[in-house]
């Protein structure tokens, strides 16, 4: 099965390994992502006519909204960016403008393509790095030597390369020439200013400018890898492919969309700039051209997924034009005690497995009794009911509290197997059991 060619059923099966429940949300998102692939198989003229059906996900924090979209984008190798609507300001105000989310998507897309090209050239890059270091470690062969000497040198070079690959010479120091560290560019400024910045930097910081550095062989490997990658990769082709991929397959996840909804409940306290951000967002979601440092990008075929809890507002509090641009609505269920238990026991990379792996590094074995896991799920669920509902994130705070002493004094438990019982969970979370001092468990 190719990741790019996953069917909706295969996508949902993949998501089931990491996210419990939320069948309707998984199904809707899987179809939307599959339609990205279907559209690209059509004739060019028909491709232009088909625009993505943007999705509005409604559900409390910690129920899996972001994780569903992020997981699919990752497995399907699609350009993806997650942003928070509340971080943007209306044009004319101090802060980030909404177009910067598209520029962030393009940056991620170019990086994705660059990493793919590096992976294809991985062996070639590593060979070039090892050869360059080996030649630095071996004294150069004088001119006019016999064929026999040349062969001996070639054999010595080969042996040296093998030792470098095996890490035998990692601590040896060598002097190499590396490019001067490039000046950081603020990608949040408008593209016109970005281009001016880049031109100024190129003028004062020519590519051939290099400095000599004494590094260990291990450090030299990394320094040369980055430099040789730049010489072997076709930068322009990568930029063009990244721009094209963002335009045709990009996904922008806008979290906290409810924070810019103008709620009637707020009365006179409402922020007038919220509606301004919505109106700035509208042309991007509808389809417009945004200038980036890599060139202009059309946004009409980018898939937008908006998400929010909508505790203090309703989806209908968004301006009607923006509501119309998110025709698919999915409501995610709040997490029950049973689902909390399943999250701890059935997901591929459950929180329990993560903590077991972390403590195994210190030589500490951790085992959870089933009753202990059920108690963790129960107490986490109760905490969500009695204070702010933060979904599965509550499990992180409760497990962290239970394992806090073991994590802190891990060296004292090295070589031991520790069993987490129901009684231990209750004693560590006694404030939670007694419904006291809940603030400790609120993120």
Swiss-Prot record:
GO cellular component: HslUV protease complex
Binding site for ATP: 20, 62-67, 255, 321, 393
A GO BP annotation: proteolysis involved in protein catabolic process
Keyword field contains Transmembrane helix: no
Pfam family, one: AAA
Family annotation (HAMAP family): HslU
Oligomer and partners: A double ring-shaped homohexamer of HslV is capped on each side by a ring-shaped HslU homohexamer. The assembly of the HslU/HslV complex is dependent on binding of ATP.
The protein's name in its UniProt record: ATP-dependent protease ATPase subunit HslU
Protein's gene: hslU
């Amino acid at each position: 099965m190719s990741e790019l060619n996953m069917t909706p059923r295969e996508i949902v099966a993949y998501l089931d390994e990491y996210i419990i429940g939320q069948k309707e949300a998984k199904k809707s998102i899987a179809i939307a992502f599959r339609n990205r692939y279907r559209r690209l198989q059509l004739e060019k003229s028909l491709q232009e006519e088909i625009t993505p059906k943007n999705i509005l996900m409604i559900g409390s924090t910690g129920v899996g909204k972001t994780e569903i979209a992020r997981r699919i984008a990752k497995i399907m190798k699609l350009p993806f960016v997650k942003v928070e609507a509340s971080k943007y300001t209306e044009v004319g105000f101090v802060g980030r403008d909404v177009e910067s989310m598209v520029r962030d998507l393009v940056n991620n897309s170019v990086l994705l393509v660059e990493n793919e090209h590096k992976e294809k050239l991985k062996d070639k890059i590593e060979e070039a790095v090892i050869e360059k270091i080996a030649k630095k470690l071996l004294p150069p062969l004088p001119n006019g030597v016999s064929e026999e000497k040349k062969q001996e040198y070639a054999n010595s070079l080969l042996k040296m390369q093998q030792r470098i690959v095996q890490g035998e010479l990692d601590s040896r120091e060598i002097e190499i020439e590396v490019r001067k560290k490039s000046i950081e560019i603020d990608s949040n400024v408008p593209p016109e200013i970005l281009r001016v910045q880049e031109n100024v930097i190129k003028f004062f910081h020519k590519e051939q400018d290099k400095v000599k550095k004494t590094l260990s062989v291990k450090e030299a490997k990394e320094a040369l890898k980055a430099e040789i990658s730049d010489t072997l990769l076709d930068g322009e082709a990568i930029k063009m492919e990244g721009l094209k991929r963002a335009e045709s397959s990009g996904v922008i996840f806008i979290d906290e969309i409810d924070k810019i909804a103008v709620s009637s409940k707020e009365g006179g306290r409402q922020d007038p700039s919220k509606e301004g951000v919505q109106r700035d967002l509208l042309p991007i979601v509808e389809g417009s051209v945004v200038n980036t440092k890599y060139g202009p990008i059309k946004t009409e075929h980018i898939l937008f997924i908006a998400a929010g809890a909508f505790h203090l507002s309703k989806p209908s509090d968004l301006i009607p034009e923006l509501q119309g641009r998110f025709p698919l609505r999915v409501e995610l269920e709040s997490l029950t005690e049973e689902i909390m238990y399943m999250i701890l026991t059935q997901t591929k990379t459950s929180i329990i497995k993560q903590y077991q792996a972390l403590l195994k590094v210190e030589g500490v074995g951790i085992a959870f009794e089933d009753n202990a896991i059920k108690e963790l799920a129960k107490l986490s669920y109760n905490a969500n009911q009695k204070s702010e509902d933060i979904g599965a994130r509550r499990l992180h705070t409760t497990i962290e509290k239970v394992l806090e002493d073991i994590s802190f004094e891990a060296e004292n438990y090295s070589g031991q197997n520790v069993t987490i019982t129901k009684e231990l969970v209750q004693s560590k979370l006694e404030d939670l059991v007694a419904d006291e001092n809940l603030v400790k468990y609120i993120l």
